[in-house]
């Protein structure tokens, strides 16, 4: 239709409006099954609704990846619908655009959210276990912890004379036979090590090592001295004590007695000129009475 207003030509187009079908013939149960019930586009009940049967726009809706009808869910009218839905015709949980409509609602994911993402910060995080909880010291307690020493670890007056063999004892090497020097050097080094770590228990493996080394050098000495030697009873007493004590070292007193017996065995080869004779007289007296070195006990007369 063309209208003229002065020198202006106006073209007016009219579009026929489709009259709405009367809903009077529908039963109330068909129009509204329950208060607040609404059929959403894209649902199986939307296409079968009497109002939309003749509408070509909703006759065939394309199946979108976000909406797929699960077989068997909507076949039964009494079916509860999708999991988590309030009614038999609940809207799809996925947020897809169906027939020009968009559902603004957002459902919480079923999987565990990332606790470090900002959008999931409202989710409850796992509780900290008791074994990982930080223990707070009680009020009034000191903020720092002092190491507590066992009084038994402190050196006593009885232990003050332990391990007298030091670096000066290495001067004996030049006066010992060549086959005795390695053993004596080992004895001095172990004595220095134990003196520096007197607060810790002596290592048992060290005592066993000294026992093996002592038996080796004693066997070599016996093979080289087939004839009777005046040193035989003294060295026999020393090696017997070493063999017995070596596997049983538990305290520093045990290790001290073992080392002094080993050094005494070595220094017997220059007993007349040894500068440590007074030291052995103090620390090795137990060897003579323990193994019968000396005059045999006299049998008391019968009458």
From Swiss-Prot:
Q: Where is this region: Disordered?
A: 20-97, 134-160
Query: Which Gene Ontology molecular-function terms are recorded?
Result: zinc ion binding
Q: Per the record's keyword annotation, is Zinc-finger included, yes or no?
A: yes
Under InterPro entries, the record lists: EHV_Unk
User: What does the induction field say?
Assistant: Expressed late in the infection cycle.
Which family is annotated?
A: Belongs to the herpesviridae US10 family.
- UniProt protein name: Virion protein US10
GO CC entries: host cell nuclear matrix; viral tegument
Question: Which keywords does UniProt give here?
Answer: Host nucleus, Late protein, Metal-binding, Virion, Virion tegument, Zinc, Zinc-finger
Stretches of Basic and acidic residues bias are at 46-62
The listed locations are: Virion tegument; Host nucleus matrix
UniProt's post-translational modification comment states: Phosphorylated.
Question: Which intervals hold the zinc fingers (unnamed)?
Answer: 262-274
């Amino acid at each position: 239709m063309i209208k003229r207003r002065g020198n202006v030509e106006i073209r007016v187009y009219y579009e026929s409006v489709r009259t709405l079908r009367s809903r009077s013939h529908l039963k109330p149960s068909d129009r509204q099954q329950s208060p607040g019930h609404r059929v959403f586009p894209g649902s199986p009940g939307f296409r079968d609704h009497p109002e939309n049967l003749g509408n070509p726009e909703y006759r065939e809706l394309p199946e979108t990846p976000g909406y797929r009808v699960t077989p068997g869910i909507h076949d039964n009218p009494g079916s509860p619908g999708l999991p988590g839905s309030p009614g038999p015709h609940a809207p799809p949980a996925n947020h897809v655009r169906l027939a020009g409509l968009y559902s603004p609602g957002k459902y919480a994911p079923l999987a565990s959210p990332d606790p470090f993402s900002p959008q999931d910060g409202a989710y409850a995080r796992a509780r900290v276990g008791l074994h990982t909880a930080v223990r707070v010291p009680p009020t009034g307690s000191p903020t720092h912890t002092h190491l507590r020493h066992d009084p038994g670890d402190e050196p006593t007056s009885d232990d003050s004379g332990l391990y007298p063999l030091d670096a000066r004892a290495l001067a004996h090497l030049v006066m010992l036979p060549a086959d005795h020097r390695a053993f004596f050097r080992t004895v001095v080094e172990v004595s220095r090590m134990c003196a520096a770590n007197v607060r810790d228990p002596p290592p048992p493996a060290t005592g066993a090592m000294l026992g093996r080394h002592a038996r080796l050098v004693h066997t070599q000495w016996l093979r080289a001295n087939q004839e009777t030697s005046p040193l035989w009873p003294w060295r026999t007493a020393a090696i017997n004590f070493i063999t017995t004590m070596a596997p049983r070292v538990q305290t520093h007193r045990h290790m001290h007695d073992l080392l002094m017996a080993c050094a005494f065995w070595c220094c017997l080869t220059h007993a007349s000129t040894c500068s440590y004779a007074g030291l052995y007289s103090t620390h090795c007296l137990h060897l003579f009475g323990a193994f019968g070195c000396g005059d045999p006990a006299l049998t008391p007369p019968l009458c």
